[in-house]
Curated annotation (Swiss-Prot):
Motif, 'HIGH' region: chain positions: 43-51
Location in the cell: Cytoplasm
Catalytic activity, EC: 6.1.1.6
PANTHER family: LYSINE--TRNA LIGASE (PTHR37940:SF1)
The protein's name in its UniProt record: Lysine--tRNA ligase
Length: 580
């Protein structure tokens, strides 16, 4: 079998799962090509970065299996026939009037006002589909509305009804169990708890609420479309089913062998699909993996449908740093689209690839994003020179491309923090931004902003949407005459030393060397003396000198890194503001 793209072999968690998935697939269907992995997403509101783990975990495993030359299908089951449970807060174009649709299938709920999409589910699905395309995630999408309403699962539904007592007996083992005491965790805020919600209604009615016995099937009402229905009678031979709606009082008798307006309850629906699709690998969120949860119960119910439970790691929570400051209109839970506005898809893929599914991690929307980018660029350099550790190199390979090839990358990936500072100071003036970026490396200047894109655009979007106004950099229009007049002789001397060497050091590296060198030279040491050769007071002198420069240039104690700031302000203006 041909190897499509280089496999990273057994160096990280992804390759270990790929080994298991290939072996398990062969055990279940010897000699049959094709491996099936799955994700489930409920488009009940904005699909956020916690849900993205539901997709990225199987995607990375599927991609590794594909790199080894196997056929793979990554199914994304859109749980769009789930009931509409609540009106999410903070969604533009949605008000309390949407509460009247609670209980209907998500595909029967109107889309938010102004949406080009036909219904609620399609509206939220579309944003996720676009993000997955940008991230290079290949998948086969399956609408559960389409599956149920076209009768695809008819045999499975009739089979579940026939074996309802067996299903009830399995569920009954868990109904009386008390939930175990939860391990104490740091309290999560409401938005984070919402972000931890998985697909499918984890706490949904399991079909045992009716007085006529247990039924694993719930019709949607033929009059009001809601699932507030109770099955009151069912005949196995004729498949005649009678239900009554508690919302509107409607009741009818239908033939289940012909009726397509209802679904299996979640704890039965999920294992039915494992068997139907032959799923070998599907992860589950914390809410689906606890004792008595859908994943555990499903492992027993799947046998009734003649299938086996997939290999399925439980994935941990994805947190957000900078959540409070986020201007997200989503009621505080950012989506993959929000992240992709401020970071390249490679960085977002890397955050999911480098941590095992059971490790939680945070995605940065605050200053931390600059540090993450520094870390990514260092890894990029190590991979290029062959010094990266195997697991780090594997995560990098999974981030930059898939079995289908490399993702488009920024031709000249200049440091993110530099790009952010330049975007901050130039405030949308592209000609100024290009001038500054062209001076970063005079020996090899960039000729067009396109060379720094899309990274430049992401950094600019971050500055404009996630950096509070009081942290933005505003360069002084006029010199601070009062401060300049009050300076003592050592301070004046430090400014003279800086200005004298400005022209000769006018590049990012040159200015970095120069601003750190001035306090050393002033104290009688060579500019290139290392910290080990210097007394500790030099560090204090450097801090004092930097604070003085910030005050004279931007009127604050701190700001962007000085070399970037000096380049951004430009030589002539620096000389004016420093009193030359």
């Amino acid at each position: 079998m041909p190897i499509v793209a280089q496999s990273t072999e057994t160096t990280d968690w992804v390759s270990r799962f790929a080994d298991e998935v290939i072996a398990e697939s062969e055990r279940r269907a010897p000699g049959k090509p094709g491996v099936v992995v799955a994700s489930g997403l409920s488009p009940s509101g904005p699909i956020h970065l916690g849900n993205l783990r539901e997709v990225m975990t199987p995607h990375l495993v599927a991609d590794e299996v594909r790199r080894r030359g196997h056929e793979v299908r990554h199914l994304i089951s859109w749980d769009d026939y789930d009931r509409y449970r609540k009106v999410p807060a903070g969604v533009p174009g949605v008000d309390e009037s949407w509460a009247e649709h609670i209980g209907k299938p998500l595909t029967s709920v109107p889309a938010p006002k102004g949406s080009p999409h036909p219904n609620w589910a399609e509206h939220f699905k579309a944003a996720m589909v676009d993000s997955l395309a940008e991230m290079g995630v290949e998948f086969d999408g399956i609408s559960q509305t389409a599956q149920y309403t076209s009768g695809v699962y008819r045999e499975q539904i009739l089979h579940a009804m026939k074996h309802r007592r067996d299903i009830d007996a399995i569920l009954d083992q868990y109904r009386t169990k008390k939930a175990p005491a939860k391990k104490s965790q740091k309290p999560l805020d409401e938005a984070e708890l919402e972000a931890a919600e998985g697909s499918g209604a984890a706490a949904e009615d399991d079909g045992s609420s009716g007085s006529a016995g247990y039924f694993p099937y719930k019709p949607y009402c033929g009059n009001c479309e809601k699932d507030l229905t109770t099955v009151t009678a069912y005949d196995d031979d004729s498949t005649e089913l009678t239900y009554a709606c508690t919302a509107c009082g409607f009741s009818e008798t239908v033939r289940l062998s012909e009726f397509n307006r209802g679904k299996l309850v979640w704890k039965v629906d999920w294992p039915m699909r494992w068997a139907y699709e032959g799923v070998v690998f599907e992860p589950s969120g914390v809410d689906h993996s606890s004792p008595g949860s859908s994943f555990q119960v499903g492992g027993q119910i799947v046998g009734i449908f003649g299938g086996e439970q997939p290999i399925g790691p439980m994935y941990a929570f994805v947190g957000i740093s900078g959540m409070a400051k986020m201007s997200s209109s989503k009621g505080g839970v950012p989506t993959p689209a929000d992240a992709l506005k401020i970071m390249e898809p490679q960085l977002l893929r890397w955050l999911y690839a480098r941590r095992r599914p059971n490790q939680s991690f945070k995605i940065a929307f605050d200053q931390e994003i600059q540090r993450l980018y520094d870390e990514w660029d260092r890894l990029d350099a190590k991979v290029a020179d062959g010094s990266a550790l195997p697991a780090d190199a594997a995560a990098h390979a999974r981030a930059v491309g898939t079995a289908a090839g490399e993702l488009p990358r920024t031709p000249r990936p200049l440091p993110y923090r530099t790009l952010a500072s330049v975007a901050d100071i130039t405030a949308g003036h592209e000609d100024q931004a290009l001038r500054i970026l062209g001076e970063l490396d005079p020996a090899n200047p960039i000729a067009s902003l396109d060379e720094a894109r899309p990274r430049y655009d992401k950094a600019e979007a971050w500055i404009n949407t996630h950096v509070p106004a009081d942290q933005r950099t505003i360069v002084r229009q006029e010199p601070d005459a009062e401060l300049l007049k009050s300076l003592d002789e050592p301070s004046r001397q430090s400014l003279r030393l800086l200005l004298d060497g400005l022209a000769d050091h006018w590049s990012l590296d040159g200015l970095t060397h120069h601003v750190y060198g001035v306090p050393k030279v002033q104290a009688g040491f060579p500019a290139d003396a290392t910290p080990k050769e210097l007394p500790p007071e030099i560090k204090t002198a450097q801090r004092t000198f930097f604070a003085l420069l910030y005050h004279l240039l931007v009127g604050r104690d701190t700001g962007p890194r000085l070399p970037t700031l000096l380049l951004a302000v430009g030589q002539d203006r620096v000389r004016t503001l420093l009193g030359e």
